Amino acid sequence: MLEINDLKKTFDNSSPALKGVNLKINKGEFVSILGPSGSGKTTLLRIINGLETSSEGEIYFDNLKVNNSTIPEIQKKTGMIFQEFNLVNNLSAINNVLTGLLNTSSKFLSLFYLFKKNQKI
């Protein structure tokens, strides 16, 4: 479950990129975040994933308050695909995807060991 309470993010004392964001997503729900360019979608996702800090408000993930000490645990259960990204040139597509799982012990990761080394996915 993800719960966001009165989230606000301001950059450089300017107008807030996010203001008064409240959201609750229950386990198993699928949610889309839609809006025009510059409306704060990416900022919201970056805050949820611990890549940015909020100016105000609280976020809970699986009833765990998101803060500097809980971010590593939360990042084991979440992921983010960035709008702008760079591939590691000498890695295959699957290895580029798996680089985000380097510090996890996920059952998902174990699925990739079912494939033989030279088998294409």
Predicted features and spans:
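ABC ATPase nucleotide-binding domain signature
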Residues: T78, F82-N86, L91
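Short coil-to-beta microelement around the adenine-binding A-loop and adjacent beta1/P-loop entry
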Residues: S14-P16, P72
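ABC ATPase NBD coupling module
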Residues: K65-G79, F112-K117
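ABC nucleotide-binding domain "signature motif"
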Residues: S55-V66
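The feature captures the beta-strand-to-loop junction immediately N-terminal to the Walker
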Residues: L34-P36
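Short coil-to-helix segment of the ABC ATPase nucleotide-binding domain corresponding to the Q-loop/switch region
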Residues: L91-S105
